[in-house]
Every structure is written in C-alpha cells, then in structure tokens.
Amino acid sequence: MPQQIELRNIALQAAQPLVHGVSLTLQRGRVLALVGGSGSGKSLTCAATLGILPAGVRQTAGEILADGKPVSPCALRGIKIATIMQNPRSAFNPLHTMHTHARETCLALGKPADDATLTAAIEAVGLENAARVLKLYPFEMSGGMLQRMMIAMAVLCESPFIIADEPTTDLDVVAQARILDLLESIMQKQAPGMLLVTHDMGVVARLADDVAVMSDGKIVEQGDVETLFNAPKHTVTRSLVSAHLALYGMELAS
C-alpha cells in the first residue's frame, strides 16, 4: 500500500475554470486540512481525487501519484482511499439496511464480511447495540449515527488514506465532538493519511498536522498548523484565523 498520495497541478473546468493548479501531498500518519470558504474548490478537489466529479465538470490538467507513480482515481477509491462524506444520508441507499451496506462494501473490496467483523467496526465507533444497528435503515438513524456508520465503513475498508469532507457539518455540538474523537482515535490506532476538508478552524486546530488554504479555486497558503495559526500570511488565512480567535476573545498578532 502507498505511503504517499500526491495531487499535482490539478485543474478543473465546467463552463469556466473552477480549480487552478492545485497540488497537495497526503502522507501516512498525518492529517492535511484543506480549508477555505464555500465555493473555494475544496469538495471539487476531493471529487477529482476520487474520480467522482459532478456532471459537466472535467479535469483539464494535472495528475495523481501514489508513491511517485501515476495512478487512476478509480484505482484509489475504496481500496486505497476511504471516504467520509459531508452529507452521510445521501451516501446510503434508503432501501438497504446497515448490514447490507457494510457487507457489500467489504465484499467489493475483498475484505472479511462476517457478522463478527461488522459488529466490531460498529462497536469501535461507539454505536450501541450493534446487532440492532445492523438492522436499521438510513431513515431510522440520526445524522450523527449515520456519520458514525460512515466512519465504521471507513474502518472496514482498512484503506491507508481517508478523505473526510466536512465530517462535522450539520451535527449538533455533542455529535461533532464525538465524531472528532473518533477521527482522532483512527489516526492514533491506524495512522492513515487523512485529507480533512473543513471550514472550521477549531477542527483544524484539534486534528491537523498541516494546512492548505483554498480561495477561488487556488491554494493560497500551505504549511504546518502551528505556523499557519501563529503567522498566517495570506489575507484569506488571516481572516480565517482571526475569526477563530475572536470566538475566544483573542486577536491575531499584527
């Protein structure tokens, strides 16, 4: 399995250019946070990595490398990169139980799909009464439960990399904290490389090792998390950090 995945000069276009020359490097055991405002190109960059671009959007330049060798996004999805989506409800077939979803995911990737394995993954993400959860349909579960189930599926994939696209969006504060605890636990126990897409600098401060800031489809600043919080250079980065510090009655040093 690869130790590093690199996005090199990715460009995306629809009727007009959307993403311009984006380069990112994911490394095993490190969390790279991709931050920026809505419409900055974060989710499109993830979609390009996984080969799931929306209709009408095409990649016009760039390549993806695994340990320095060119690779197709389709060869990465699921096997080498597990995904935790922004809206978990849209990721599940409403006609299938959690057991069916989990089992089919495992079988598609050639992983063990016995009930003991599925139960262990569900228990690992803190969902109580795994036998009952496996019988549930998506509409019978809260957003927080579905997000935990997505994380359980990522655990079942045993992929060396994870893309987590706004994993705490639309969750209450308690559910957000639990999801962050789970992601932190996965990093400690399995040490995958993680691309964490978020607009929440509090999430960045807690989980990230490195940060890339996007604005208008471009990476405008990139570096380790401590440097970006203490000495942000670009105006977009300064605005993000200042807004985060203001929540705690603090100001960014001039």
From Swiss-Prot:
Main location class: membrane
Keyword annotations from UniProtKB, A to Z: ATP-binding, Cell inner membrane, Cell membrane, Ion transport, Membrane, Nickel, Nickel transport, Nucleotide-binding, Translocase, Transport
Residue ranges of every copy of the ABC transporter domain listed in the record: 2-241
NCBIfam families to which the protein is assigned, alphabetical: nickel_nikD (TIGR02770)
GO molecular function: ABC-type nickel transporter activity; ATP binding; ATP hydrolysis activity; nickel cation binding; transmembrane transporter activity
PROSITE patterns, A to Z: ABC_TRANSPORTER_1, ABC_TRANSPORTER_2, NIKD
Species: Escherichia coli (strain K12)
Protein name listed in UniProt: Nickel import ATP-binding protein NikD
Keyword Nuclease belongs to the record: no
Subunit structure: The complex is composed of two ATP-binding proteins (NikD and NikE), two transmembrane proteins (NikB and NikC) and a solute-binding protein (NikA).
Signal peptide residues on this chain, from the entry's feature table: none
Membrane topology, from the record: Peripheral membrane protein
EC number: 7.2.2.11
Compartments reported by the entry: Cell inner membrane
